[in-house]
Amino acid sequence: MTENNDIKMVIITGMSGAGKTVALQSFEDLGYFCVDNLPPMLLPKFVELMADSKSKMNKVALGIDLRGREFFEHLWGALDDLSERTWIIPHILFLDAKDSTLVTRYKETRRSHPLAPTGLPLKGIEAERGLLTDMKARANIVLDTSDLKPKELREKIVQLFSTETEQAFRVNVMSFGFKYGIPIDADLVFDVRFLPNPYYIPHMKPLTGLDEEVSSYVLKFNETHKFLEKLTDLITFMLPHYKREGKSQLVIAIGCTGGQHRSVTLAEYLGKHLKPDYSVHVSHRDVEKRKGH
């Protein structure tokens, strides 16, 4: 491993019910490779696999559950081993919460505490807190989630662990053909089959909306201009609200019949319109499918 291949590793642990699941989901949104409930004794082997991997796995978040004293012996040894590896940068994130908050969360979810499966949650919380005293002391960051809603916890993690680029709200604009199905990951879908179709002009049939002649044709119509005016106004209004609600990305799908001409032209237009203000990626799902509209 070289310095250019340094791996940032975050070990997520803490009190049961303090938000580990939300934390892992947040790291996943930040592009981390996430593994939940990794036994501490497997950490050295996992690190070896990362070192041997030819993939660009340079950010890893591990959820580690520590409910038995024997786990700590393995963990301390593994952490000492990590400290000797110059190409890996480990951080320990300890999630905590007030006892009263944890009790309330267990009651709301009707789950039993793992250390008190048949008893009162508070007994299990007290036992777990005692087990985790040393772990909390060793953590780089201790985060109290008592007064944090899931959305607020996510925002806190993004603030603590993301770069400016990773914090950017990502917008994916995709063209597609309805004949091949609506993209299952689309958040917003717009149908542009009402616009004039270049497919029926013989010399444009084999072309796509990426070709200047096709895009100029589609964009020359008054109805296209009116639609784009309304579409850009709507999207520009909606995006800040989606971002404020905690979404890390939005997929906008624009469809025509075959996904080659009209939808491609408008997806390109929308992408260029949004790029000055957002991190935008434009893709064309069906542009290579030459099967006719």
Curated annotation (Swiss-Prot):
InterPro entries named among the record's database cross-references: P-loop_NTPase (IPR027417), RapZ-like (IPR005337), RapZ-like_N (IPR053930), RapZ_C (IPR053931)
Tagged with keyword DNA repair: no
Binding sites annotated in the UniProt record for ATP: G14, M15, S16, G17, A18, G19, K20, T21
GO molecular function: ATP binding; GTP binding
UniProt-annotated binding residues for GTP: D65, L66, R67, G68
Annotated keywords: ATP-binding, GTP-binding, Nucleotide-binding
One protein family per Pfam: RapZ-like_N
Keyword ATP-binding attached: yes
SUPFAM superfamilies: P-loop containing nucleoside triphosphate hydrolases
Family listed: Belongs to the RapZ-like family.
UniProt xrefs under HAMAP family: RapZ_like
Described purpose of this protein according to its UniProt entry: Displays ATPase and GTPase activities.
Record-given protein name: Nucleotide-binding protein Bcer98_3698
Organism: Bacillus cytotoxicus (strain DSM 22905 / CIP 110041 / 391-98 / NVH 391-98)
